[in-house]
Swiss-Prot record:
Originating species: Mycolicibacterium smegmatis (strain ATCC 700084 / mc(2)155)
UniProt cross-references to InterPro entries, sorted A to Z: DesT_TetR_C, Homeodomain-like_sf, HTH-type_TetR-like_transc_reg, HTH_TetR, Tet_transcr_reg_TetR-rel_C_sf
Protein's name according to its UniProt entry: HTH-type transcriptional activator FasR
Alphabetical UniProt keywords: Activator, DNA-binding, Transcription, Transcription regulation
Annotated region of DNA binding: 52-71
Activation/inhibition comment: FasR:DNA binding is regulated by long-chain acyl-CoAs (C14- to C26-CoA), which act as effector molecules that modulate the affinity of FasR for its DNA binding sequences and therefore modulate the expression of the essential fas-acpS operon.
Subunit (UniProt): Homodimer.
Annotated function: Transcriptional activator that plays a central role in sensing mycobacterial long-chain fatty acids and regulating lipid biosynthesis. Activates the expression of the genes encoding the fatty acid synthase (fas) and the 4-phosphopantetheinyl transferase (acpS), whose products are involved in the fatty acid and mycolic acid biosynthesis. Specifically binds to three conserved operator sequences present in the fas-acpS promoter region. Essential for M.smegmatis viability.
Region named Disordered: 1-30
Domain HTH tetR-type: 29-89
């Protein structure tokens, strides 16, 4: 680490996201990723309304004109940050549901996917489920897409593995996702009062108590 970086660290100053100093030239995709990381940190720390493009550019170690070369407005930047986290969450849930054909284990995998997302991307979880800008239609739409995509993944499995008609299967899927989201949120916001495995298992036991009565063709 350079003397300048050491000095900044001793003073408690934050280094630019990605560790790049202002002025370093990066490939466009790499620079965009760096900006999204910095913006995510600032939006979580400050909220949408209090966050400023100056602060985001400074956190990323770039000038504000460079930031505007990639994102024409704060809303566009916020939506790009949100989409990145949404993609990670939905991908994790879908992948979890493909890990086994045992329905109880599949339920556990789905619940655990939400807790894993919190554990590895708490910034993303807060932006999706606790953001302060859901009154903006485009933001609300993206949050809705995230929830519905997770619900759709669960619904597809319930529909395929049971004789339930579509509306009943979807209501169950909506309930399972809501239980997972709220349990994981409680766990995060209360400083993880129990270990993750215990939190996941408790949520699964509660959900399975109802799901076990659904006439599944595979168990």
């Amino acid at each position: 680490m350079s003397d300048l970086a050491n000095t900044a660290e001793r003073r408690g100053e934050k280094r630019p996201a990605g560790g790049n100093r202002r002025g370093n030239r990066l490939p466009r995709d790499e620079r965009r990723g760096q900006l999204l990381i910095a913006a995510s940190e600032v939006f979580v720390d400050r909220g949408y309304h209090a966050a400023g493009m100056d602060e985001i550019a400074d956190r990323a170690g770039v000038s504000k004109p460079v930031l505007y070369q990639h994102f024409s407005s704060k809303l566009e930047l916020y939506l790009a940050v949100l989409q990145r986290h949404v993609d990670n969450l939905v991908s994790g849930v879908r992948q979890a549901l493909r890990t086994t054909t045992d329905n109880r284990q599949r339920l556990r995998a789905a619940v655990e996917a939400f807790f894993d997302f919190i554990e590895h991307d708490s910034q993303g979880y807060r932006l999706i489920f606790e953001n302060d800008y859901v009154t903006e239609p485009q933001v609300a739409a993206q949050v809705k897409v995230a929830t519905e995509a997770c619900t759709d993944a669960v619904f597809d499995l319930i529909s395929r593995d049971s004789g339930l008609e579509a509306h009943r299967a979807r209501m169950i899927a909506v309930g399972l996702v809501a239980i997972s989201v709220d349990s994981a949120r409680y766990w995060l916001n209360n400083d993880r009062p129990i270990d993750k495995d215990s939190a996941v298992e408790g949520t699964v036991q509660f959900a399975w108590g109802g799901l076990s009565h659904v006439p599944l063709t595979r168990s």
